[in-house]
Amino acid sequence: VVRIMILPNVKDVVSIILTMKMMILCCVITVKSAGIMGLSQLDFEDLRGYAIMIKVLFICHGNICRSPMAEFVMKKLVSDANFADHFQIASAATSTEEIWNGIGNPVYPPAKAELARHGISCEGKRARQVTKADYAEYDYLIGMDSANIRNMLRIFGGDPDGKVARLLSYVGSERDISDPWYTGEFGTTYNDVLEGCTAFLRYLQQNGRIDT
């Protein structure tokens, strides 16, 4: 009689345990699925943000005059247009002439002063040399003159993705931006840089890279 009473209880206990295991398993699967869906949603939002990030590298010979002027003029233009969150903008040199013991020189004082006259700060900027890895990192690699372009192509080993351009090509000009280190015409260089950067921003808008 005792055995007859115990056996049904054991079966009931086993049945309850199995049922609980199934319920727990279902809960785990549901939670994991929800987690995966949530993660996918987050990843999608992140990827969408990265998709509209436009990476621009301005390049000149020494990275102390023209390319830093272009970098900070472009930063101001995109900030004024409320596009700053969509851009990563920097500048570099094709040479190491302004880099000593691994430390780059700051922006050349007359170039810095010209930017300051237009309310633009370049504080903290130091020269650095462009590398082959920059080709993969940036969407647009923009030189100031034809010599810059030749040196860029040498460093990158070509331009298979069509990322390299001269700044004034965006205004439809074949003209180079002269190096004010030699000309002393920092105001002229600023105007050329501003014209080129403005046209470049317009190009991005017209080609659907950023919303207008």
Go through each PLM region and give its residues.
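A broadly conserved sequence feature marking short terminus-proximal activation segments
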Residues: 1-6
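The −1 position to Zn-ligating cysteines in a subset of zinc-ribbon hairpins
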Residues: 9, 27-33, 55
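Local cysteine-cluster metal-coordination motifs and their immediate loop/turn environment
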Residues: 12-14, 66
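Cys/His-coordinated zinc-binding microdomains
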Residues: 14-17, 32-35
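Short linker/helix segments within small regulatory modules
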Residues: 20-28
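Short metal-binding segments enriched for Cys and/or His
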Residues: 36-40
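Short, Lys/Arg-enriched N-terminal segments with co-localized hydrophobic residues
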Residues: 41-52
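Short polar/charged helix/loop
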Residues: 50-212
